[in-house]
Curated annotation (Swiss-Prot):
It holds the Pfam family Dala_Dala_lig_C. Binds 2 magnesium or manganese ions per subunit. It comes from the Bacteria. Its main location: cytoplasm. Mg(2+) 1 binds at residues 275, 288. Residues 121-321 form the ATP-grasp domain. It comes from Phocaeicola vulgatus (strain ATCC 8482 / DSM 1447 / JCM 5826 / CCUG 4940 / NBRC 14291 / NCTC 11154). Cell wall formation. This is D-alanine--D-alanine ligase.
Length: 324
């Protein structure tokens, strides 16, 4: 009997549109001969299932069920592809845990920690992993331009501490731009991370593990036409993405080993993607960890799956079946 899979998309952040694109990607990737697939759209209090005829019907949040043709349908598995709250920060994971519904991503604790960039990076720094110098600023508190310059220096990045797709991120080069950048970041998050700029090559590496296999994908090098890998570079084609990355083999191997190690240190589950920057002397520096990475046809993970010579349908089946 076919399992019924919910591809859960949407969310309550600026990343909603990106998430809906990822849902379409996943719908095309997952094996429809093996699974019954439905896209579930969440936006605030609107939780709806998209039915095969394109109409939408509400989800019963008491048990995450829905009605189709007068029959109550229950989901066997949730593939979470919400980028941002509530799907990337542990909230939705906790809901599914309460209902006993298995899901694709990391658990509550890991999701919450990795969504908090500052906390995650400081935690991993304790394991000897290189990260940029940074500080955290919470809503209601202020920091002077001089403090930023003295503690972090210029240029620097000012970004929402919780968020993705580069919404609210500014590369700050001058003293005059510090406060406007902080205000912009606070529009996306209650906490702002101020991070030292690192000059180097941006790369990203995907990974997943099951009970009987470990897969670390070929690394992608990101060459942005913009100041940094911002929203335009990510989604409007304003970057060159090279897979496999043009790295010395020993550096690439260190990145692959580090990606696998971080997966285990944090206790990740499902597909993750880790962003790094390679600085002078082939030093590998962690930027951030994505536990619900983009899954559009042109996203990094599908690119890396193709470069590895794998079938993305098989990868999706691995992720789902590992939870049963």
């Amino acid at each position: 009997m076919k399992r019924t899979i919910a591809i859960v998309a949407g969310g309550d952040s600026s990343e909603l549109v990106v998430s809906l694109r990822s849902a379409q990607g996943l719908y095309s990737f997952i094996d429809k001969e093996r699974y019954n697939l439905y896209i579930v759209e969440m936006e605030g209090h609107r939780w709806e299932v998209v039915l095969p005829d394109g109409s939408k019907t509400p989800i019963d949040r008491n048990d995450f069920s829905f009605m189709e043709n007068g029959e109550k349908k229950q989901f066997d598995f949730a593939y979470i592809t919400i980028h941002g709250t509530p799907g990337e920060n542990g909230i939705l994971q906790g809901y599914f845990d309460l209902l006993g519904i298995p899901y694709s991503s990391c658990n509550v604790l890991v999701s919450a920690m990795t969504f908090n960039k500052f906390t995650c990076n400081q935690y991993l720094k304790g394991f000897g992993i290189r990260v940029a110098e940074s500080l955290i600023l919470r809503k209601g508190f202020e920091i002077t331009d001089e403090e930023v310059i003295n503690k972090i220096g210029l240029p620097c990045f000012i970004k929402p501490n919780a968020g993705g797709s580069s919404f609210g991120v500014t590369k700050v080069k001058t003293k005059e731009d510090i406060q406007p950048a902080i205000e912009k970041a606070f529009e996306e998050s209650d906490e702002v991370m101020i991070e030292a700029f690192m000059k180097g090559t941006e790369i990203t590496c995907g990974c997943y593990k099951t009970s009987d296999k470990e897969v670390v994908f070929p690394i992608t090098e990101v060459v942005s036409a913009n100041e940094f890998f911002d929203y335009g570079a990510k989604y409007n084609g304003e970057s060159q993405e090279i897979t496999p990355a043009r790295l010395p083999e020993d550096t690439a191997e260190r990145v692959r080993l580090l990606t696998s190690a971080i997966y285990d240190i944090l206790g990740c589950s499902g597909l993750i993607r880790i962003d790094y920057i390679i600085t002078e002397g082939e030093k590998v520096n962690l930027l951030e960890i994505n536990t619900t990475p983009g899954m559009t046809a042109t996203s990094f993970i599908p690119q890396q799956v193709r470069a590895a010579g794998l079938d993305i349908k098989d990868v999706m089946t691995d992720i789902i079946e590992n939870k049963f």
